[in-house]
Amino acid sequence: MNRLLQRQLFLENLLVGTNSMFHQISKHSINTCCRSL
């Protein structure tokens, strides 16, 4: 049970980290596109 819970927490952290990273990248690319226009 404990191991399964740890695995779930790890997967959730991974998902949140990837999500925030993706948002930062998309925000940065949108800003770059707006500046080049």
Swiss-Prot record:
Localization annotation: Host cytoplasm; Host mitochondrion
Keyword Calcium on entry: no
Family: Belongs to the rotavirus A NSP6 family.
Protein name per UniProt: Non-structural protein 6
Quaternary context: Interacts with NSP2 and NSP5.
Database matches in Pfam families: Rota_NS6
Transmembrane regions listed in the UniProt entry: none
Subcellular location, principal: host cell
Keyword list, A-Z: Host cytoplasm, Host mitochondrion
GO cellular component: host cell mitochondrion
Source species, domain of life: Viruses
rRNA-binding recorded as keyword: no
